[in-house]
Amino acid sequence: MPSRAVLPRILGALFYYSPERPEVKALFDCLPTLPELYPWRDRGHIESLCASWSLPDDDALTWQFSVLFEGQGKMPVPPWGSVYLEKDNLLMGETTADYRAFLQSQGMVFTDREREPEDQFGLMLLACSDLLAQGDNVAANRLLEAHLLPWGFRYLELLQHNTVSAFYARLAVVATCYLQDVQQQQGLQPENKRLFF
């Protein structure tokens, strides 16, 4: 896997999969190495974030993930793009259909995702990682410009200020730094879309 694909794969997995999964638990050991996995503009800042990153106990982190990503009652920070981009904050709206069409045009079909929209933040990072792993930088950049960046920074801003989980707030800070660096380094021009959340 190309080095450019590694960090979005790790971040995507942390945003998408439950911390109960053994493969996600293994990623926690990688957190101190994140500064080495990407040519950060401010590596010292990332080193500081990762060095002081504390993990709650397993049960607490599982509960936090459930509240923030699966929903227990009203979700404080929904992780789906359509909530931010659709006027009525609906899941599986027109923006999700547009993103699904983009994925299909790249040969990416999520047949086992029938119950969850493809525009979940972590799942989008995983798709970006797959495109980078295939060497398709143009499609990866298009995914970011048209589908993730128009709402992603708003989502990450809200997640940084959540009162449920300091761990996921820190993850949002690191992901924000990553996406800002990618945007600057690749010269990306995100589509300007109105946000409703």
Kindly label every feature range from the protein language model.
Residues M1-F197:
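Charged, alpha-helix-forming regions
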